[in-house]
Amino acid sequence: IIDIKKSKYKKEEWNTFLKEGQELTIPAGSEEIVEIDAGEEMTGYLHLLLEAGKGSKIEILQAESYIYDELCGPAQVPLKKDRCDFVNGHLEGYTDEYLAGGFGTEEQAEEYETFWFRTFRFIHLKIKTGEEDLTLKSFYYEETGYPLKIATKVKTSDESLDKIWEISARTLQRCMHETYEDCPYYEQLQYAMDSRVQILY
């Protein structure tokens, strides 16, 4: 958890839920809003397991970074400075919405899974319960991508370049699925020159 916008639970309790599967129960007629940091950009299928909570509305927004209200450039796009700045920035991105059916039990959870992989570094999770308590049993992602064997490495006297190598390898990993793609978050298209550079690795 990078930030709690609105919650009856503390950050430690949310982290225990995410990392260890300790259930959280959200009372009827209440709202929870938290933001989660995956640590790096990921591609994966999101899974949310629920018990009861019929009529609860769940929004899962996926974002690459925090952005600012300030617009820049001729296209007037939101400014990205410190991509982890949750104090001054906010998250914008693609959102999945789910209305809980309420049929999840202690033995057999109701499960929401995305139909296609999602790309994210940050997730804005908003839950608004209806007339029933909702128990969150688990929330995780199943990482996906074409297996990439890192066959080379770069070593220099400048240690700051090690991070650039890691970012480059991770970028390639995140852009390999059924096809090579220019980026996993936006177009997900197979442009000729992007693909050629990727194939050469």
Where are these regions (language model features)?
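Extracellular/oxidizing-compartment recognition motifs
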Residues: 1-182, 194
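Glycine/proline-enriched, intrinsically flexible loops and inter-domain linkers
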Residues: 186-191
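Well-ordered alpha-helical scaffold segments within catalytic/enzyme domains
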Residues: 197-201
